[in-house]
Amino acid sequence: MSDKISFLPPEPIQLLDEDSTEPELDIDSQQENEGPISASNSNDSTSHSNDCGATITRTRPRRSSSINANFSFQKAHVSDCTIVNGDHGTKFAVWRITVFLEPNLKAFAAKRESYKIQTYKRYSDFVRLRENLLTRIKTAKPEKLNCLQIPHLPPSVQWYSSWKYQEVNLNKDWLAKRQRGLEYFLNHIILNSSLVEMTKDILIQFLEPSKRVA
C-alpha cells in the first residue's frame, strides 16, 4: 500500500450473514459482461463452468487450480472489511482475503486440516492485480486467449460522485456490492487452471500474507 496507514480498532463492518458458512457468489448478475460462462443445474447446486478449467458453484467449486505440487486453489472468500485511517484525514476499506487450498498429496489430505492463505487488500490492490494479469496474457498465443479472460472488477466511485467520495466509498450498501464483486473476480481467476498456470507468480505475490501496520 502506498499510504502510511494505521488500523482502527478491530471492529470490521459486518457485510455477510454470520450464519452462512459458504459464501454465495453473485454469478448471475455478472454473466452478461464476463464472456462465455455456461450454466448447468444439478440436484443440490447451481454450477457455472467453462472449457478452461474453471468451475464456480454457488455452494462449492467442482474443480481446483494447481498452484504448486502440493496444493491447488479451492475457493476464495472476501469477507469483513476494516476502515483504515490514511494520511491527510483520508479513510479507505481494507478487505480480508481468505483463499482455501486443496492438498494434492495424500500425505496432506490425510491430516484433514484446513489449509488456507489469509491476507488483507484494498480495492486499489485488486486494480493492480487485474492490470498485471491483462499485461501477462497479452503474451499468450491467440488460440489460448478464449481461456484467459479476465473479469471486470466492481466499479469505482463515479466521477459525478467524486465530490462526496468518502461518503459514497464507505457506504455499507456500496461496500456490500463491492465485496460480492471482488469475491466473484478472485474466484473466477483462481479457478481457471489455464490462467493460474500462466500467471502463477503474479497470484502468489498478490496473496502474500500481509502484516498489519500499527
Swiss-Prot record:
Of the GO CC terms on this record, one is: nucleus-vacuole junction
Q: Which domain of life is it from?
A: Eukaryota
Q: Effect of gene disruption?
A: Decreases VPS13 levels at endosomal membranes and nuclear envelope-vacuole contact sites.
Q: Which Pfam families is this protein grouped with?
A: PX (PF00787)
Q: Function, please?
A: Recruits the lipid transfer protein VPS13 to endosomal and vacuolar membranes.
InterPro entries membership: PX_dom, PX_dom_sf, Ypt35_PX
Q: Which cysteines are joined by disulfide bonds?
A: none
Compositionally biased tracts (Acidic residues): 16-31
One molecular function GO term is: protein-macromolecule adaptor activity
Q: Residues bearing Phosphoserine?
A: S65, S66
Share an example GO biological-process annotation for this protein: protein localization to membrane
Question: Per the entry's comment, what about the domains?
Answer: The PX domain binds phosphatidylinositol 3-phosphate (PtdIns(3)P) which is necessary for peripheral membrane localization.
Q: Which organism is it from?
A: Saccharomyces cerevisiae (strain ATCC 204508 / S288c) (Baker's yeast)
Please give the family membership noted in the entry. Answer: Belongs to the YPT35 family.
Impact noted for substituting Y123A: Abolishes partially PtdIns(3)P-binding
Q: Name its cellular compartments.
A: Endosome membrane; Vacuole membrane
Phenotypic consequence of P12A:
Disrupts interaction with VPS13
- Supply the name of the protein: Endosomal/vacuolar adapter protein YPT35
